[in-house]
Amino acid sequence: MIVFPEHALERMEERGASRQEVRRTVWEEESFPDRQDRMGFRFEFEFGAEWNGTYYEKKELTVYAAPGGEDGSDWIIVTVISRFY
């Protein structure tokens, strides 16, 4: 399960990332260790649309999450970084 705290949801909205995109990035894409037992996940999406008045071909999400749940199999989203290009 992926848990979206209010802070993460606010940052996602500000940065143009949907829950669906974050879920895909966490479950299906490249991961890398981060500090303090967190993990980072990264995925490049075909975008082909405007964001804040500028057209971009691609969008890259970097998701930082901490393990959660009783058995550590859940992910609690810490923050999401979006990069458009």
Placement of each model-derived feature along the sequence:
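Ribonuclease/tRNase effector modules and their secretory precursors
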Residues: 1-85
